């Protein structure tokens, strides 16, 4: 293939050049994995997008990071799998059908077409031959196979359960999908309902999922901690309390003469001042049948949401019953029994005792209902007579006080002593205490009352009951002829689709109308990418080659949703026999967001495209372009359509090119932190693109005829040392995801190279050879981040192959011994940046390097240098 390059005399035109190189990559199928490849495997994957309509800058940053890793690893000699697909089921498509009268399938595939084109504009090194959408029949067919496999292994259950019901979306939500008591998509206040639901038995893997976190050394500690807390293993005691009635509850006491509480702090029993039961506890239900006020209280609690997250933020509320609980260590102490909104029935036993002195939730409750607060843990070094609990509970360590036989013990010692005493005491013929382990993790409810999801392959027969769809009858396809003229699930109104013969008895039966939670779709897609053409859900040979994913990239918001479900699915697939490994993702990187200033006027939010910003008297001012009216500059926040602080990637690519966008989103801050989008930052990246091209333009006539070689003496040797050090440090930065540091080093090295390239015609042959090697290194290192520019420059210098097909350069360890120094550069006494020069550089060499810096040049647009103060190996101050 003949590779043409730009006329070296022209300004670099990113749009034309980028399209050219993308076409060449596509034609040669550079990034497509074939079975003939036999090098070491490396699987890099970014969380695939929901096809909402257009990509945003968060997508750009996420996928650019993954692409840098993919291109770097490919150059390092790996066979790299870097696929792309679409997380395509979900409520937004149905909402669009309701609002715009567009079928969800049409809406989804139209959006995919647009977003695919946008992603291709970025020059991502993706294997598009493996592309699929989770709404493709071929994909959800295999997902239904997996459901049947899980069903056969006993990992699927159908049971009536209280569920989180979103009254707007009219569907069930998992606990993780309820945020502050509201639906994560609709924002509606979640209600509690009892429905027959399908569950995946993720709780069977609680211990294994917890233990597996210790092996995930390449995961952020924060994510591992979040999952550990969500799984929520605790070691505690089941404590049985005798019940007494004050009045009106004698019948309840006959049926329930005791209540069992679960506690991780039996050491604090002498500080207990109340018991609290869940609104769903059998005792609560029995009392409510005879007490209308209690019944109303329970209904009110349910309307506020009953998830852990909702209850943590809700005001603590209780209803005092006529029951009293007898203290297990002192029968003369009787504690009031409350029905409380903060106790969950599905954790522990649905009953707790409250120790207000040493627990914030209990203190809040006791403070509201004027209950006693008795401290039983004394901080070390404190005086028991003076110690009181005032505004906040004491939750630290210490020694036990006011606790009878536990006094003087540490809380840990008191736990054991209390447990032993309770295990030896009897109540109604059984020990009053029993050690147990509890997990917070609950089974995953996957039933959703909506159309646009994977149909659950189940048939309901009046004679045979619940019957799985035979594997040979799959897929159960979604019907296209549905209506969206009202909320709810259209499948429930589609009698023709529902009607089916029972595969066991042949009688008329009905299909399951619930579809699967969309998190099921994303829980195994990474495995399907290894062989998306396989007839079974996965190809075992491909799985063995590629899994686990070496590097997974996505947002930390998925720590206890997608990431935990994917870990469960991997274990379930191992149990079925599809895979041999436990974990889906060996390495995980969670990137920060792209954020932007917000702007407002009297009419509301204003977009960045509608304003101009000037600096006046040291302050930035914003005005509307249309009428020059003043606009208030607000906080820097996550880009969102609602606040209009979004920047369309298409517009930026059209103006500056994809390489500029890729370079900027990685250059401005560490990748795990948020990056602030600024027009000046993008313009700076664009200037760098043009500067690189100018350097190539000036040097190409000479360098294209030069064979690269390491310098052996003088300035040529110093340049080679700098080039090899750059190669070593940038390689280390890329391995550590320190993309911003790598970019900073590339800026610095161009500052070293540029003055020499400007006088290329007059330098000695040894320097020319050293410069050619340095330029080759430089282009190889910018290629993962700015692939189009690197290809164009490589071709301009006479390259006969694609730079993306070249191996990563190798540095000489003998040349990376540190003999450079980095000097802070001040302008009028204020630090503006740094310059790296040889430790032995003369003042003239330092001055030349400083004058070549972009930020120095920017300050010289309207001003001139009065003097430059250089303290060798210390500092440079430019006085304007």
UniProtKB/Swiss-Prot annotation:
Q: Where is this motif: 'KMSKS' region?
A: 638-642
**What is one GO cellular-component annotation here?**
cytosol
Q: Which reaction does it catalyse?
A: tRNA(Leu) + L-leucine + ATP = L-leucyl-tRNA(Leu) + AMP + diphosphate
| UniProt keyword Phosphoprotein, yes or no | no
One GO-annotated biological process of the protein:
leucyl-tRNA aminoacylation
Q: Which GO terms describe its molecular function?
A: aminoacyl-tRNA deacylase activity; ATP binding; leucine-tRNA ligase activity
Entry keywords, A to Z: Aminoacyl-tRNA synthetase, ATP-binding, Cytoplasm, Ligase, Nucleotide-binding, Protein biosynthesis
Location relative to the cell: Cytoplasm
The listed location of motif 'HIGH' region is 49-59
The UniProt record lists the EC number as 6.1.1.4
- Entry keyword annotation includes Ribosomal protein: no
Mind telling me which InterPro entries this protein's record contains?
aa-tRNA-synth_I_CS, aa-tRNA-synth_Ia, Leu-tRNA-ligase, Leu_tRNA-synth_edit, M/V/L/I-tRNA-synth_anticd-bd, Methionyl/Leucyl_tRNA_Synth, Rossmann-like_a/b/a_fold, tRNAsynth_Ia_anticodon-bd
Which HAMAP family does the record match to this protein?
Leu_tRNA_synth_B (MF_00049_B)
Cite the NCBIfam families for this sequence: leuS_bact
In which family does this protein belong, per the annotation?
Belongs to the class-I aminoacyl-tRNA synthetase family.
Query: What is the designated name of this protein?
Result: Leucine--tRNA ligase
Q: Which organism is it from?
A: Bartonella quintana (strain Toulouse) (Rochalimaea quintana)
Q: What is the lineage of its organism?
A: Bacteria, Pseudomonadati, Pseudomonadota, Alphaproteobacteria, Hyphomicrobiales
């Amino acid at each position: 293939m003949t590779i043409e390059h730009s006329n070296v005399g022209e300004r670099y035109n990113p749009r034309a050049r980028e399209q050219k190189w993308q076409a060449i990559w596509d034609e040669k199928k550079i990034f497509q994995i074939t079975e003939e490849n036999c090098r070491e495997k490396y699987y890099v994957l970014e969380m695939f997008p929901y096809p909402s309509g257009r990509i945003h800058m968060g997508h750009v940053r996420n996928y650019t990071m993954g692409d840098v890793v993919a291109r770097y690893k490919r150059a390092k000699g790996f066979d790299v799998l870097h696929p792309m697909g679409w997380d395509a089921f979900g409520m937004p498509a149905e909402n669009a059908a309701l609002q715009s009268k567009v079928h969800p399938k049409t809406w989804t595939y139209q959006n995919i077409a647009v977003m695919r084109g946008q992603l291709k504009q970025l020059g991502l090194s993706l294997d598009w031959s493996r592309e699929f959408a989770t709404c493709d029949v071929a994909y959800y067919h295999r997902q239904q196979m997996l459901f049947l496999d899980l069903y056969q292994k006993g990992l699927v259950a159908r049971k009536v359960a209280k569920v989180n019901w979103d009254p707007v979306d009219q569907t069930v939500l998992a606990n993780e999908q309820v945020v502050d008591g509201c639906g994560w998509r609709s924002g509606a206040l979640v209600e509690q309902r009892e429905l027959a639901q399908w569950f995946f038995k993720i709780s069977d893997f609680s211990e294994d999922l917890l233990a597996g976190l210790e092996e995930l050394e390449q995961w952020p500690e924060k994510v591992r901690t979040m999952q550990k807390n969500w799984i929520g293993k605790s070691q505690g005691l089941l404590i049985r309390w005798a019940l007494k009635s004050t009045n009106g509850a004698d019948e309840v006491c006959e049926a329930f003469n005791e209540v069992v509480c679960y506690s991780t702090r039996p050491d604090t029993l002498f500080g207990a001042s109340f018991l609290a039961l869940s609104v769903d506890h059998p005792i609560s239900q029995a009392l409510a049948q005879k007490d209308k006020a209690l019944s109303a209280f329970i209904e009110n609690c349910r309307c506020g949401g009953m998830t852990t997250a909702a209850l943590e933020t809700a005001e603590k509320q209780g209803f005092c019953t006529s029951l009293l609980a007898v203290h297990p260590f002192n029968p003369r102490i009787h504690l009031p029994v409350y029905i409380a909104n903060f106790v969950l029935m599905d954790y522990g036993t649905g009953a707790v005792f409250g120790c207000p002195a040493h627990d914030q939730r209990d203190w809040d409750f006791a403070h509201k209902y004027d209950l006693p607060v008795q401290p039983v843990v004394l901080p070390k070094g404190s005086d028991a007579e003076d110690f009181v609990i005032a505004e906040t509970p004491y939750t630290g360590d210490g020694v036990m006080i006011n606790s009878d036989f536990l006094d003087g013990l540490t809380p840990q010692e008191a736990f054991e002593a209390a447990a032993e005493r309770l295990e030896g005491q009897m109540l109604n013929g059984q020990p009053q205490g029993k050690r147990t382990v509890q997990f917070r993790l609950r089974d995953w409810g996957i039933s959703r009352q909506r159309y646009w999801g994977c149909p659950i392959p189940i048939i309901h027969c009046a004679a045979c009951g619940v019957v799985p769809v035979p594997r040979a009858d799959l897929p159960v396809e979604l019907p296209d002829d549905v209506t969206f003229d009202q909320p709810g699930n259209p499948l429930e109104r589609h009698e023709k689709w529902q009607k089916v013969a029972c595969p066991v008895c042949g009688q008329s039966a009905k299909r399951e109308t619930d579809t699967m939670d969309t998190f099921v779709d994303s829980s195994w897609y990474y495995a399907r990418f290894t062989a998306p053409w396989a007839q079974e859900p996965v190809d075992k040979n491909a799985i063995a080659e590629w899994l686990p994913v070496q590097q997974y990239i996505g947002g930390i918001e998925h720590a206890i949703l997608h990431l935990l479900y994917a870990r469960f699915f991997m274990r379930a697939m191992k149990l079925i026999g599809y895979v041999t490994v436990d974990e889906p993702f060996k390495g995980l990187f969670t990137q920060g967001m792209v954020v932007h200033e917000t702007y407002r006027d009297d009419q509301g939010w204003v977009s960045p495209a509608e304003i101009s910003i000037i600096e006046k008297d040291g302050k930035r001012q914003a005005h509307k372009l249309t009428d020059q009216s003043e606009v208030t500059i607000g906080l820097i926040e996550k880009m969102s359509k609602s606040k209009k602080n979004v920047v369309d990637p298409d517009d930026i690519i059209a103006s500056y090119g994809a390489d500029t966008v890729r370079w900027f989103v990685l250059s401005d801050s560490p990748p795990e932190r948020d990056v602030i989008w600024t027009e000046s930052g993008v313009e700076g990246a664009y200037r760098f693109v043009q500067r690189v091209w100018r350097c190539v333009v000036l040097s190409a006539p000479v360098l294209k005829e030069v064979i690269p070689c390491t310098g052996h003496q003088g300035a040529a040797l110093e340049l080679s040392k700098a080039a090899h050090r750059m190669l070593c440090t940038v390689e280390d930065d890329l391995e550590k995801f320190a993309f911003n540091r790598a970019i900073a080093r590339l800026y610095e090295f161009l500052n070293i190279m540029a003055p020499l390239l400007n006088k290329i015609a007059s330098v000695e042959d040894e320097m020319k050879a050293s410069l050619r090697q340095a330029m080759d290194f430089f282009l190889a290192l910018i290629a993962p981040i700015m692939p189009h520019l690197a290809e164009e420059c490589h071709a301009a210098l006479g390259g006969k192959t694609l730079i993306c097909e070249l191996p990563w350069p190798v540095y000489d360890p003998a040349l990376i011994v540190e003999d450079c120094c980095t000097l802070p550069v001040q302008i009028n006494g204020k630090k503006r940046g740094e310059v790296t020069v040889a430790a032995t550089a003369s003042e003239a060499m330092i001055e030349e390097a400083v004058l070549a810096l972009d930020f120095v040049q920017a300050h010289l647009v309207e001003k001139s240098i009065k003097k430059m103060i250089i303290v060798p190996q210390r500092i440079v101050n430019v006085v304007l």
